[in-house]
Regions:
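Active-site core segments that coordinate phosphate-bearing ligands/cofactors
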Residues: 1-155, 164-188, 194-249
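Glycine-rich Rossmann-fold phosphate-binding loop(s) that bind the pyrophosphate
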Residues: 161
Length: 249
């Protein structure tokens, strides 16, 4: 509700420890494709359906920072990552091995060794690996979301604490090939307030409430700027498919 979207051509990522990617629908979708892709239907405000998927989020970088005894802030890790070469590794960030490893850095390094890829070593390389692969993951799931809902998504709203990460926002715009609008960071609290105001006639409806949210907070827009990103997403999808086949052997 705290997401300042309008119309039907937008999706959202609630970006925190975990990422919730989805769209606001009028009716639920309970198809085999939705089941296979692990999307769920949740009741939303005013009879809407939040069609979404819970995927990996900032947990990865939180654990990377913890494993370095918080020597670097999240902003410093992002700055270091921005200076590194992009897309040096492909990682399935939704693999169960990243849910609660003893050491997140070592888990990423082990994954890269096992898959025959360059192993990230420095704090910047590790952070870049995390951010690149989160963005690639978002791109794959946005494709799934569009295929299942039949909607063409032109804008992706990123809300929550993760919306403050400018590097990840730009990487997401590039990988997803859509406009990304980031903010507000406190969308959960704002949404709670907005629903109460709609219920007490502070706003006439949800659409007017969302217009007020848009007018009340600084939002940052990111446009796709990497012409090679879509080819990289396709390579990433091939990598995931190959890893899935190997897991079945």
């Amino acid at each position: 509700v705290g997401t300042p979207g309008a119309g039907e051509d937008w999706a959202y990522i609630s970006s925190g420890t975990w990422s919730l990617m989805g769209a606001e629908l009028k009716d639920g979708i309970a198809t085999p494709a939705a089941y296979d892709a692990n999307f769920t239907n949740e009741w939303g405000v005013a009879g809407s359906i939040r069609f979404l998927k819970n995927i990996m989020g900032m947990w990865l970088i939180q654990e990377v920072a913890r494993m370095q005894d918080y020597q670097y802030s999240y902003a410093e890790l992002a700055d270091m990552a921005a200076k590194e070469a992009p897309y040096q590794q492909f990682v399935n960030v939704n693999d169960d091995r990243f849910l609660n490893p003893a050491n997140m850095i070592e888990e990423f390094q082990a994954y890269c060794r096992e898959t025959g890829q360059k192993v990230p070593e420095t704090p910047g390389e590790i952070a870049r690996c995390v951010y690149d692969n989160l963005a690639l993951c978002y791109a794959v799931e946005l494709k799934n979301l569009q295929a299942i809902t039949g909607r063409k998504i032109n804008k992706l709203h990123i809300v929550g604490g993760g919306s403050n990460n400018r590097l990840l926002n730009q990487l997401t715009a590039d990988a997803c090939n859509v406009t990304v609008e980031a903010g507000p960071g406190e969308a959960t609290a704002i949404g709670n307030l907005v629903v109460q105001m709609v219920a007490t006639s502070g706003f006439g409806d949800l659409a007017s409430a969302r217009k007020a949210v848009r007018a009340s907070f600084d939002l940052h827009t990111y446009e796709p700027s990497n012409p090679d990103a879509q080819a990289i997403v396709e390579e990433y999808e091939t990598f995931l498919a190959n890893q899935c086949q190997l897991a079945r052997v």
